[in-house]
C-alpha cells in the first residue's frame, strides 16, 4: 500500500523513518515515562504541603508542570543547535560556569536557605547554580578532551589542566556549601577523563590526595565527621540528626512488595521532610513497593544505556565531541540517581541531591531535560558520518 493511501491521521513510513533518524525512540520513551511519573509523584507527595502553606493543593504540581514545559522547550532548542557551535563555545562555557559559581556567593545576589547559599533569584524562579554547572562542565570537558586528546593521554599537564578547573569549581560549591553538587561535578569530570584515556596512576594519586584531605578534616573538625557518619546508625538519635533518615526508612519499609497505593503514603503527611524533593523516592517506594522500585530503576537504566549507546555510535561515526557529551550525560544521570537512592536508603550521608526527572525543583528538571535534548542532538548527528575524525578512536587501556 502506498503512503498516499494510508488512513487519515496515520503517519507514513517516511515520516516514521525521519523520526527514528532524528530522535532515539527508546531514550525518548524512557525519559517521557520518568517525567510523567515525576509529575504524578510530585502531586501525590505535595498535596497536603501545598494546602497548608499556600492554600492550593496543586501548588507544587502546577509549578512542576510549568518547569517541565520550560524544560521541554529548551530541550528542543538543544536538539536543534548543531554540536559544532557548542564545541566552539567551550571557553565561554567555562567562563559562564565561574560567573555562576562566584555570583551566587556575592551578598545581595545569592539567596540563603537553611544556612546554604545555593540559589540566584530570577523573578518567580530560583536558579540553583549547581544544576546548570553540571551540564556546562560536561560540555566544556567534552570540548577539552577533543582539543587536547593526545596531551591528556600522554602528558601529566593534559590531566592537570581540567583538574584545576574542577578543583576551583569544587571549592566554590563547598563554600555555598553544596557537598552533593561538588561531589557530582568532580565525579563527572573524573569519569569523562577516565573514559578519554587518562592514566590510572594519575587517578590513584588523586585518590590518595583526597584521602589525606579527608583524614585532615577528621582530625581538625571531628564534629563534621560525626555529622557525616550519623547515617550509619540513625536510630541512635531518631529525633535529631537521624530524624529524616529514619522517616525515610519507615516509608520504604512500609511499601512492602506492592506498595500502599498511589496517594496513600503516610510519611508524606509532614513526617518526612522534603518528601516532594530530595526524598521523593522514599514516598515512591512506600506507594509502589519493591516492584515499583525495580521498574523505576529499570527506566533509569534504559536512559543511561541509551546515552552510552548513542555515545558509541557517535564515536564510530567520527563525532568525537558528541561522543564525549553523551558519555558525560550518562555518567551524570547514573551517578546522581544512584546517589539519591543510596541517601534515601541510608547507604550514604544525607545531603541535598535531587532525583533526576522526579524530584520537585525547576533547576534540576529543566537542566535534566536540556541534557536529554543535547544527547538527542548527538544521536541525530551520529546518523551522518563525520567528514573527518576530530580525534583518534579511543584505544583500550594498555594498548600503545
Swiss-Prot record:
Periplasmic face residues: 46-63, 110-118, 175-177, 221-278, 346-354
Transmembrane segments: 25-45, 64-84, 89-109, 119-139, 154-174, 178-198, 200-220, 279-299, 325-345, 355-375
Enzyme class: transferase
Main localization (coarse): membrane
Pathway assigned to this chain's UniProt record: Cell wall biogenesis; peptidoglycan biosynthesis
GO cellular component, one term: cell division site
Membrane topology note: Multi-pass membrane protein
Pfam families (alphabetical): FTSW_RODA_SPOVE
Catalytic activity: [GlcNAc-(1->4)-Mur2Ac(oyl-L-Ala-gamma-D-Glu-L-Lys-D-Ala-D-Ala)](n)-di-trans,octa-cis-undecaprenyl diphosphate + beta-D-GlcNAc-(1->4)-Mur2Ac(oyl-L-Ala-gamma-D-Glu-L-Lys-D-Ala-D-Ala)-di-trans,octa-cis-undecaprenyl diphosphate = [GlcNAc-(1->4)-Mur2Ac(oyl-L-Ala-gamma-D-Glu-L-Lys-D-Ala-D-Ala)](n+1)-di-trans,octa-cis-undecaprenyl diphosphate + di-trans,octa-cis-undecaprenyl diphosphate + H(+)
Swiss-Prot/TrEMBL keywords: Cell cycle, Cell division, Cell inner membrane, Cell membrane, Cell shape, Cell wall biogenesis/degradation, Glycosyltransferase, Membrane, Peptidoglycan synthesis, Transferase, Transmembrane, Transmembrane helix
Residues in the signal sequence: none
GO terms classed as biological process: cell wall organization; FtsZ-dependent cytokinesis; peptidoglycan biosynthetic process; regulation of cell shape
Known EC number: 2.4.99.28
Topological domain spans for side Cytoplasmic: 1-24, 85-88, 140-153, 199, 300-324, 376-400
Subcellular location: Cell inner membrane
Molecular function (Gene Ontology), one example: lipid-linked peptidoglycan transporter activity
Family, as annotated: Belongs to the SEDS family. FtsW subfamily.
PANTHER family named among the record's database cross-references: CELL CYCLE PROTEIN, PEPTIDOGLYCAN GLYCOSYLTRANSFERASE FTSW-RELATED
Stated role: Peptidoglycan polymerase that is essential for cell division.
Name of the protein this chain belongs to: Probable peptidoglycan glycosyltransferase FtsW
Organism field: Thioalkalivibrio sp. (strain K90mix)
Gene name, Swiss-Prot/TrEMBL: ftsW
Amino acid at each position: 500500500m502506498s503512503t498516499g493511501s494510508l488512513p487519515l491521521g496515520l503517519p507514513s513510513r517516511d515520516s516514521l523513518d525521519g523520526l527514528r533518524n532524528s530522535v532515539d525512540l527508546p531514550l525518548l520513551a524512557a525519559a517521557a515515562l520518568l517525567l510523567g511519573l515525576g509529575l504524578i509523584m510530585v502531586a501525590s507527595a505535595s498535596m497536603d504541603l501545598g494546602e497548608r502553606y499556600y492554600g492550593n493543593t496543586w501548588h507544587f504540581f502546577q509549578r512542576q508542570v510549568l518547569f517541565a514545559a520550560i524544560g521541554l522547550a529548551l530541550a528542543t532548542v538543544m536538539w536543534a543547535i548543531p554540536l559544532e557551535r557548542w564545541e566552539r563555545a567551550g571557553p565561554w562555557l567555562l567562563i559562564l560556569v565561574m560567573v555562576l559559581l562566584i555570583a551566587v556567593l556575592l551578598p545581595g545576589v545569592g539567596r540563603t536557605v537553611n544556612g546554604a547559599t545555593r540559589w540566584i533569584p530570577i523573578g518567580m524562579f530560583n536558579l540553583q547554580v549547581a544544576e546548570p554547572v553540571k551540564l556546562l562542565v560536561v560540555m566544556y570537558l567534552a570540548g577539552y578532551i577533543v582539543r587536547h586528546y593526545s596531551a591528556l593521554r600522554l602528558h601529566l599537564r593534559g590531566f592537570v589542566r581540567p583538574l584545576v578547573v574542577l578543583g576551583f569549581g569544587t571549592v566554590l560549591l563547598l563554600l555555598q556549601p553544596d557537598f552533593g553538587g561538588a561531589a557530582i561535578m568532580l565525579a563527572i569530570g573524573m569519569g569523562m577523563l577516565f573514559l578519554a584515556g587518562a592514566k590510572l596512576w594519575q587517578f590513584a594519586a588523586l585518590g590518595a590526595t583526597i584521602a589525606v584531605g579527608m583524614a585532615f578534616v577528621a582530625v581538625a573538625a571531628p564534629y563534621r565527621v560525626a555529622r557525616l557518619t550519623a547515617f550509619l546508625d540513625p536510630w541512635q538519635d531518631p529525633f535529631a540528626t537521624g530524624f529524616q533518615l529514619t522517616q525515610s526508612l519507615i516509608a520504604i519499609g512500609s511499601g512492602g512488595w506492592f506498595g500502599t497505593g498511589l496517594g496513600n503514603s503516610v510519611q508524606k503527611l509532614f513526617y518526612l521532610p522534603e518528601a516532594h524533593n530530595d526524598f521523593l523516592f522514599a514516598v515512591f517506594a512506600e506507594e509502589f513497593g519493591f516492584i515499583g522500585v525495580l521498574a523505576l530503576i529499570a527506566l533509569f537504566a534504559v536512559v543511561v544505556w541509551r546515552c552510552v549507546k548513542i555515545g558509541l555510535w557517535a564515536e564510530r561515526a567520527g563525532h568525537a565531541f558528541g561522543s564525549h557529551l553523551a558519555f558525560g550525560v550518562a555518567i551524570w544521570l547514573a551517578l546522581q540517581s544512584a546517589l539519591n537512592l543510596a541517601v534515601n536508603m541510608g547507604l550514604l550521608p544525607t545531603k541535598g541531591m535531587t532525583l533526576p526527572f522526579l524530584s520537585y525543583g525547576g533547576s534540576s528538571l529543566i537542566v535534566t531535560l536540556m541534557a536529554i535534548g543535547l544527547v538527542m542532538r548527538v544521536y541525530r548527528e551520529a546518523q551522518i558520518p563525520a567528514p573527518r575524525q576530530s580525534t583518534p578512536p579511543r584505544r583500550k587501556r594498555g594498548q600503545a
